[in-house]
Amino acid sequence: QETSAKLADTEETLQETSAKLADTEETLQETSAKLADTEETLQETSAKLADTEETLSAEIASLAEQHGVAQTLCEQQGAYMNQLLTYVRAAYNVTLDGMTEVQATAVADILRQCDYALRSVAQAASDEVEHVKEMYNMVDGNYKETAARFDILRRILGKIDQDVKEASVEIDAPERRQTCSLHPTPRRLGDVSNRENSIENKTRSASRLSGRLF
């Protein structure tokens, strides 16, 4: 009776454990489904990021080209203005004695203003290129961080799945032992027949011995 009670308690414990395991498997399936949805979303995001990366790369290349053109133009204009200023100064020094210095100063101011304007345009183009590069680096960093987080989540779910499988194996072993104890192996008929023959022989021997004594 004590063994039956212990077996009943063990069976109840196994049933509770099996129910918890079923709940854990259900939770794991739900989590796996959510992970699949998240992975699909991540793939879509990756595709969008790839498109964004391609677009940003094209914009960076275009802006870099424009910046190079603007810088080259600025250098050419600066060299041309320096040559023009030198020529004007030389020409006015030769032809107009009294007005040369005033006019040369005015022309120099105009040339400096033009040079400043060209340099400002070139600097603005360079700043825009740097801004686009920063945006690209930020998007790329966010993508890599998100991918790393999902990789950690996949590892955690894999560990949970392994623990559930190991728990299933540990639960199945006591259930098999309990089934064997509840259904013992029946004795062979030969064992019973041998026991009956032995008892019959002993009875006959006792009868013959009593006959001799009396």
Curated annotation (Swiss-Prot):
Record field: compositional bias (Basic and acidic residues): 188-203
GO CC, any one term: membrane
UniProt region (4 X 14 AA tandem repeats), positions on chain: 1-56
Region (Disordered): 1-31, 180-214
Subcellular location: Membrane
Keyword entries, A-Z: Membrane, Repeat
Top-rank lineage group of the source organism: Eukaryota
Placement of Sequence repeats on the sequence: 1-14, 15-28, 29-42, 43-56
Main location (coarse class): membrane
Protein name as annotated: Membrane antigen containing repeating peptides
